[in-house]
Amino acid sequence: MISSRCKNIKPSAIREIFNLATSDCINLGIGEPDFDTPKHIIEAAKRALDEGKTHYSPNNGIPELREEISNKLKDDYNLDVDKDNIIVTCGASEALMLSIMTLIDRGDEVLIPNPSFVSYFSLTEFAEGKIKNIDLDENFNIDLEKVKESITKKTKLIIFNSPSNPTGKVYDKETIKGLAEIAEDYNLIIVSDEVYDKIIYDKKHYSPMQFTDRCILINGFSKTYAMTGWRIGYLAVSDELNKELDLINNMIKIHQYSFACATTFAQYGALAALRGSQKCVEDMVREFKMRRDLIYNGLKDIFKVNKPDGAFYIFPDVSEYGDGVEVAKKLIENKVLCVPGVAFGENGANYIRFSYATKYEDIEKALGIIKEIFE
C-alpha cells in the first residue's frame, strides 16, 4: 500500500548515525545552534498568544513580516522585492520543497553541488526529477565551465547554498555572478539557500539574486536567531520572474493544501527578530568564530581540512584513516558524534562533518579524544 514515491526516498543518513549514539556522546553532529532563542523574540511570541493571534494567517504570511523581510533584502543586498513576492513558510525546508515541487516534472534535471545538504537530493527525487551532480574540487570550488557542460535541454534548476552545509564554504562574488550568468544564458532558475547568510567570519555574502532575476531566494530564522523549533522560513522571487511564471500563485497552491500557513504566533516572533537589535546575532557569530578557530586548529594537523568561511560546520578529508563511515563509527565508539560525508552525496565519501554549534569545552574534549585515536 505504500507509494513508490515514498519507497524511493531514503531515510536520512544523518538520523541513522544519531541512532547509533549514546546519551554520553559529545555531539558534534547536530546542525543547530546550541543557544536559546533570544528573549525579546520569545516575549513577542508570548504577547501574540496573549493577544489571541492563534488563528490562521494569510496563506503567504502576515503582511508585517513580509514587509520586514522585504526591508531586510533591501538593506542587506539592495534587492527590491515586493512583499507580495514573498511567502512565509514552515521553515526554509518548506520553501525548498515548494520551489522544487512547483518547477520540476518527472525527468527534469536539477544541478546540485556534491556534496550538499541532503534535502536537495531527496526533494528532487521526491519530485521525480533527475539529479545531476556539480563536482567540487578539493577546496570545494565550483568549475563554471563544467556546470555549463552538464546542462541539457532537460535542465531546469540549479540548487545552490552559500555558506555551505556541509563544507562551510562561502563562495566569492565571481562564482555567484558566474552562476547567475549561466542561469540567464540557459534559461535556468537558481534556488539559492541562504539560511547561513549571517554566520560568516572572514568573507562577504553575495546572493545570486543580486545578479539575476532568475532566482528563488530562500532563507529562514532557524540558524541566525537560534529558532530551529519555531519552523519559520521564507522564499522571495523577483517581480520579473513572478510575472513570467506566476510563481507565487502556483507555489501558494501547494502551500495552502499542505501547510495552509506558517504558525501565526511564531511569525510575530520572527517579526521581532528582524525589528529588534541584532546584537544577539553578533554575539552568537562571535562565539561560533571562536569555536571555528578551535576546531580547525585542532584538526589541521590530523586531517586534510579547509578552514570554514561560514556556517558552523567543518568537513575534513579522513581518507588517510579509512572512509567517512568507518571513521565516523570509530569516533562514535569513542563517544564523539559526527556525520559521515557520504550523507551529503557520494563525493563526500572520504569526509566527515563536524558541527561546532556546541559548547567550547565539549569541542576541546572531543579534540582530545580525536588526537588520542588518530595521532
Curated annotation (Swiss-Prot):
Its EC number is 2.6.1.1. One of its GO terms (biological process) is amino acid metabolic process. It is found in: Cytoplasm. GO terms for cellular component: cytoplasm. GO terms for molecular function: L-aspartate:2-oxoglutarate aminotransferase activity; pyridoxal phosphate binding; transaminase activity. Keywords: Aminotransferase, Cytoplasm, Pyridoxal phosphate, Transferase. It holds the Pfam family Aminotran_1_2. Disulfide bonds: none annotated. The modification N6-(pyridoxal phosphate)lysine is found at K223. It comes from the Archaea. Its main location: cytoplasm. PANTHER family: ASPARTATE AMINOTRANSFERASE, ASPARTATE AMINOTRANSFERASE-RELATED. This is Probable aspartate aminotransferase. It comes from Methanocaldococcus jannaschii (strain ATCC 43067 / DSM 2661 / JAL-1 / JCM 10045 / NBRC 100440) (Methanococcus jannaschii). The lineage of its organism: Archaea, Methanobacteriati, Methanobacteriota, Methanomada group, Methanococci.
